[in-house]
From Swiss-Prot:
GO molecular function terms listed in the Swiss-Prot or TrEMBL record: 5S rRNA binding; structural constituent of ribosome
Disulfide bonds: none
Zinc listed as a keyword: no
Keyword Nuclease in record: no
Name under which the protein is recorded: Large ribosomal subunit protein uL18
Source domain of life: Bacteria
Role: This is one of the proteins that bind and probably mediate the attachment of the 5S RNA into the large ribosomal subunit, where it forms part of the central protuberance.
Entry keywords, A to Z: Ribonucleoprotein, Ribosomal protein, RNA-binding, rRNA-binding
SUBUNIT field: Part of the 50S ribosomal subunit; part of the 5S rRNA/L5/L18/L25 subcomplex. Contacts the 5S and 23S rRNAs.
Length: 122
């Protein structure tokens, strides 16, 4: 029997998780996507099918700090703080965390902890 690739395992986990994680206007979903070089996070209202705010390592605000942004936990921390700041500015304090099928470890955990420290509740 062939071994299932790590990417396929992540996709299967994400499919299972999305059955239960549904964001609405009062408590939107904080979705995280992790690539090899970057990390992306969005606050999404699933009822209206609309992205409320987003942040990533390729953001314009973070371009001047591009030498510091490498694919590690410190850049995920910066993105988490930026996303929380933008969400609070739009009046969102509570979210549902969607780790996107990734394990809650490393860069995903660093982003979540930074968003919590900056004022988001989940």
């Amino acid at each position: 029997m062939a071994k299932i690739s790590r990417k396929l395992q992540t996709q299967k986990r994400h499919k299972r998780l999305r059955r239960y994680l549904i964001g609405n206007k009062i408590r939107p979903r904080l979705a995280v996507f992790r690539s090899n070089n970057h990390i992306y996070a969005q606050v999404i209202d699933d009822d209206a099918q609309q992205t409320i705010c987003s942040a990533s390592t390729v953001d314009k605000e973070l371009k001047e700090d591009s030498d510091k942004l490498s694919p590690n936990c410190s850049s995920s921390t910066i993105v988490g703080k930026l996303l929380a700041k933008r969400a609070i500015k739009k009046g969102i304090k509570q979210v549902i965390f969607d780790r996107g099928g990734n394990l809650y470890h490393g860069r995903v955990k660093a982003l979540a902890d930074a968003a919590r420290d900056a004022g988001l509740n989940f």
